[in-house]
Amino acid sequence: MSGAASRRVGFLVLCGLIAASVAPTASAQSANPSADDIVEALVPSGPRGLGMRSLRGIEETPGTETGPPSIDLYINFKLNSAELEPEALRTLRVLGQALQSPKLKESRILIVGHTDAKGSATYNQELSVRRANAVRSVLVGAFDIEADKLTAEGKGATQLKDSANPEDGINRRVEIRNVGAN
């Protein structure tokens, strides 16, 4: 292949990579939920007790409760730090807008920090708490979310999203849970 042809192929590959990076994809959309997506994920679907009936008369099967409504957000921090990366602020802006929704006005929100399994258990626990608190601070400071509505806690690497790959980045996340009315 001549030098010009090689450069042309390289240019076409580069154009394809650029086009792929700006084209919306399902994974990019799920990694960057809208405020409406977050609200929908956090709004309880109705009463969830054993033996309770829904409005349609369908009885829930005992033991099928899945816990409080929640959503995992991939909020990037600087390496081994609770300092937010610039793209994390975009995600927090969307989260802040969602938490201001009238549908979530009376909700108490639990912010749960998770890490991957790199590092010691003690270090990961402390880091996950600091990261959850960093998210809480931004929501209170920038979006006027009432501080008493938000609780931060860390789980370290105790609840891996992908336990088969404990050091994978998918395990580094912040979980947002609606834990009930204020």
For each of these PLM feature ranges, what is it?
Residues 1-67:
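N-terminal targeting leaders that direct proteins to extracytoplasmic destinations
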Residues 68-80:
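Acidic/histidine-rich, surface-exposed loop or edge segments in extracytoplasmic proteins
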Residues 78-112, 140-141, 176, 180-182:
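Periplasmic peptidoglycan-binding/anchoring modules of Gram-negative envelope and division proteins
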